[in-house]
Amino acid sequence: MLKMNLQFFASKKGVGSTKNGRDSISKRLGTKRADGQLVTGGSILVRQRGTRIYPGVNVGKGGDDTLFAKVDGVVKFERVGRDRKQVSVYPKAQ
C-alpha cells in the first residue's frame, strides 16, 4: 500500500504587533532668556527638572523648578563655586 504524506503550509503568515511607533511629547525644557537680555518681571528664564541652575538675585523658583524674573532688568548667568550655576536679574540703570 502506498501512503501519502501531505502537508499544507499557511498561505498567510500570522501578523505580529510592532513594538515601535510611540513617543512622548517634548517638554520644551531649557534656557528661555540669554545672558545680557532685557526681561520684565514674571518672565520665565529657565525651564528645568530639578535645580540644575539655581536662582540668584531677583529670581524666583516655581514649584516645578522653573526660574522666573521678579523685577524688570538684565539677565546675568553666573558661576558660584566650582560646580554651581545661578541666574540673576539686575535692574537696568536709568
Curated annotation (Swiss-Prot):
One GO molecular-function entry: structural constituent of ribosome
Protein name (Swiss-Prot/TrEMBL): Large ribosomal subunit protein bL27
GO BP, sorted A to Z: translation
Domain of life: Bacteria
InterPro entries, A to Z: Ribosomal_bL27, Ribosomal_bL27_CS
Post-translational modification: The N-terminus is cleaved by ribosomal processing cysteine protease Prp.
Annotated keywords: Ribonucleoprotein, Ribosomal protein
Entry similarity comment: Belongs to the bacterial ribosomal protein bL27 family.
Residue ranges listed under propeptide: 1-9
An annotated GO cellular component: cytosolic large ribosomal subunit
